Amino acid sequence: MYELNIPLGVRAELNVAELKITGKLGYTVKRFNPKYVSVKVNGNKIFLDASPNKKLTKKSTLAVHSFEAELRATMESVEKGIEKKMKILYAHFPMTIEIKGTKFFIKNMFGERVPRSTSIIGNTKVEVKGQEVHIRGVDQYDVGQTIANIRKICYARGYDTRVFQDGVYLEEAEE
């Protein structure tokens, strides 16, 4: 049995197969498979245990360790948040970034007339400041998927990528 201490200012609520972690910046919900992991919340501690089924011992032990690491990162992120920076780089055509609701648009990439667009996942906040794009959120998966979506729409289809290196690139991650 593994136990995790819940930091001050963080709250954990257990439903059937999901654990809701709430902090000062917001909340995130972590789902788990009760076939492999059993979770109990008692006061300011979370107890994790592997399945007693002998056929699933190895798999459930690995699942418990993974879920424990996920919960540690989640409890830190609901308190401090996650921020990533991306940089807008272009050499040929000056592109502009526009955000409308949960949509992210890149206009004039490679001189294209139709803007490229993608979605912003979950409660992630995206801001454009000059040549930098700041992505902030509470859930590390939502922030990561938003970055992946932005990188995916910047792919230069039909162009020599050694020459056409225009796009939005991940600059640094602030923890």
Task: Please report, for each region that a protein language model flagged, where it lies by residue.
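Ribosome-associated RNA-binding proteins
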Residues: M1-E175
